[in-house]
A protein has these predicted regions:
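Short, well-structured beta-strand
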Residues: 135-208
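Conserved polar/disulfide-associated segments of primarily extracytoplasmic proteins
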Residues: 67-153
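N-terminal "mature-domain start" segment
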Residues: 21-62
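C-terminal segment of classical bacterial N-terminal signal peptides
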Residues: 14-20
């Protein structure tokens, strides 16, 4: 009985959190090791993609070798978008917004607002539901994607990133959520086990 009561209270706390304004929502995104590091930014990101059509917040968690081109976990990371109800996060919308995000990031980091992005490309494909999903996620949808862009931090060369994307909602919430696992390594490599485990541990912190 006690466990049941605690579970009900926890679910109620999550529902209250999900109903809060996006800027007030907080998330648990588990770190595989203490060396993983992250940040939180507002969407759209005014510094590099002000034209992004999604409004809310982004939580990012980077692998230790994120910005070190000689490391096996180079440019490997996860991020979470908590955004308004519109536009709906369909494959078409995700493709458009990912292009805006990464093209803007390249231009800003390279200091070239007129950067030629004609060779940039984003593909998004719906998939069967992934086995692991964030806790309390409802109406989840799964996608894979690739992003071809100029990696602007370390190599400044063309790079192909592989993605797993999952969208979902929470009970009694008007908002949408997106979790992305990203790496230049193909999805059958060991690093993806780590990324998927992170996704399975994501949770909206309940209101206390």
């Amino acid at each position: 009985m006690k466990k049941t009561i605690l579970l009900v209270l926890a679910l109620a706390g999550v529902s209250l959190s999900a109903a809060q304004p996006l800027a007030q929502q907080q998330f648990d995104i588990p770190k595989p090791t203490p060396k993983w590091f992250g940040e939180r930014i507002a969407l759209p990101p005014k510094g590099f993609a002000p034209d992004l059509g999604l409004k809310g917040i982004e939580e990012i968690l980077f692998a230790p070798g994120m910005f070190k081109a000689d490391q096996p976990d180079f440019f490997t990371y996860v991020f979470l978008f908590a955004v308004e109800a519109k536009p709906e996060l369909t494959a078409k919308v995700l493709q458009k917004e990912l292009f805006t995000y990464y093209a803007g990031l390249s231009k800003a980091r390279l200091g070239n607002p007129k950067l030629d992005t004609s060779e940039f490309a984003v593909t998004v494909k719906p998939m069967k539901p992934f086995e692991l999903k964030p806790k309390e996620a409802l109406e989840s949808k799964s996608f894979t994607a690739t992003v071809k862009w100029i990696e602007p931090f370390a190599t400044r060369k063309m790079q192909t990133l592989h993605f797993e994307l999952q969208t979902w909602k929470y009970a009694k919430s008007p908002h949408q959520y997106l979790f992305v696992c990203a790496s230049p390594q193909p999805r059958d490599k060991d690093i993806w086990k780590t990324l998927r485990k992170i996704r399975g541990g994501v949770a909206l912190k309940p209101v206390k």
